[in-house]
Amino acid sequence: MAYKREKGLLYVVATPIGNMGDITLRAIDVLKEVDLVLCESAKETKSLFHKLGISTPVLALYKDHSETPFANVLEQLKQGKSMALVSDAGTPGVSDPGSQMVRTARENGISIVPVPGASALTALLSVSGFQVNPTYFLGFLSEKPSKKRRELERAREIEGLIVFYESVHKLPRLYPILEELFPETEVLMGRELTKAFEEVVYYANPRELANNPPNAKGEFVFLLNHRKKSLKGNSDSTDM
């Protein structure tokens, strides 16, 4: 279905997390036709647009942590301009600053339209084979080991899937915490999802992960199947 230009809308547009083929036709249509694209990094977004043949102007919202760009953007939206919000990769608002713009727009009466697509979170869930309800998403874990531990301790109270992102240089400090807090929990690791060196590896428990660590390069997402043994591997009763 072709994009129909409408005034005063903010489109929240997912972009690829690695494989350019994951951009949707609708996303391309929207990004070509809006008046302005709001982004994290102008450099990253312009690089994507060059590959897609998109010439729409871009504005980096968060470079100076100022509220001034937000005020200017809101004024233009209220005047009838249409805009799209993108992140550097994946779905805006999922472990990036995008939710701030969406919340501000909603508080000011701006209509918001999702244009869904790639996400490392849903990509790993889709290949897990685990019952996905409930899923507790932590985003990126904290930098400090003590705070990281507290976050995982709170998550341990949930019986279900626990999903989080982790930076490559923090992996050695992560493994001992997982071994202590989740000694019998299944682990699914996704590395460089949708990219050339993509890996999805299953570990029976965190000790197996620590003894056979993945290549310490790239971007990582982890899934812990933290539930009773009798529930592990069950299929969902609903599908969306």
Swiss-Prot record:
Cellular compartment(s):
Cytoplasm
Tell me a Gene Ontology molecular-function term this record carries: rRNA (cytosine-2'-O-)-methyltransferase activity
Kindly indicate whether the keyword Cytoplasm belongs to this entry: yes
A Pfam family that the UniProt record links to this protein:
TP_methylase
| Key words of the record | Cytoplasm, Methyltransferase, rRNA processing, S-adenosyl-L-methionine, Transferase
Which reaction is catalysed here? cytidine(1402) in 16S rRNA + S-adenosyl-L-methionine = 2'-O-methylcytidine(1402) in 16S rRNA + S-adenosyl-L-homocysteine + H(+)
Q: Which family does it belong to?
A: Belongs to the methyltransferase superfamily. RsmI family.
Entry function? Catalyzes the 2'-O-methylation of the ribose of cytidine 1402 (C1402) in 16S rRNA.
Q: What is this protein called?
A: Ribosomal RNA small subunit methyltransferase I
Quote the gene name from the UniProt entry: rsmI
